Amino acid sequence: MDDDEFVFIESNPTQSTWVDVKKSQQQQQQQPQAPPQQQQQQILPVYRNLNPLVDENDGFTYQQQQLYLQQQQQFCQQQLLLEQQQQQQLLLKQQQQQLLLEQQQQQLLLKQQKQQLLLEQQLLLEQRQQQQQKVPIPIAQVPASTLVVESKQEEKIQEEQEVPVIVSIINSPPPPQEEEKPQLSKKEEPEWLKGKDKAPYISTSTSDVKYTSNVVSNKPYTTIKSSTSYSSVSGSGGSGIRRISLAELNGNSKPYTSSNATNKPFTTASKSTNSYSFSF
């Protein structure tokens, strides 16, 4: 065969084959001619894998090859981006671990410093206690200046060791004072009772009521204040509602009779089993 009857076709960057040009032209002439539209479609170059170890139907067009190359390039870019992200995450994780390690070292150093300071304070306290518990030297052998200095040092140590005592003072309220109830003495008896029988009852022309005073049991009257309350008295005699005449309102001696209703300190007194209650 002549050299011009064969041409070298590179169908793949990694694969190449020698093809008989005349044989390929005869095969193209034997094939029926396609319509013009189909011939235009066949003008596009078709790359086939001419390696005998690969199937002939595995050929692909130039556009498909370019698309495949673009996809491969995009895939490589994505892989590269993913690797960069992983490296950044790994670097960030290493930085965080380094920062955590530095913080732990600082905390450990601070703890050691505190322990060292505590040991120094304890040692200083033990030295002071040993100085206080030293065997005293006879005063005759100690110079006067040394005694003065030691006494001042002892006073200073005692002042430092003194702990202030806090005393809480609670102001308790004074006890309530009992209200003194005014009582009538014999000199303060009203005029209308002077010279009369001091038996525990009052006899008038309109009503007779026998009672005993809660304030002074041997007097037929009690004190009356300028309020709406009146201490009940116990006694017996009579029934139902009785009008009673008493004296002494606000510490002033004034006679009251049952016949004059305008001057009475109260109007009615209702009797229960053992006491009278007064209504003003």
Curated annotation (Swiss-Prot):
Residues 20-41, 170-199, 251-280 are annotated as: Disordered. Residues 25-41 have a biased composition (Low complexity). Residues 178-199 have a biased composition (Basic and acidic residues). This is Uncharacterized protein DDB_G0286393. It comes from Dictyostelium discoideum (Social amoeba).
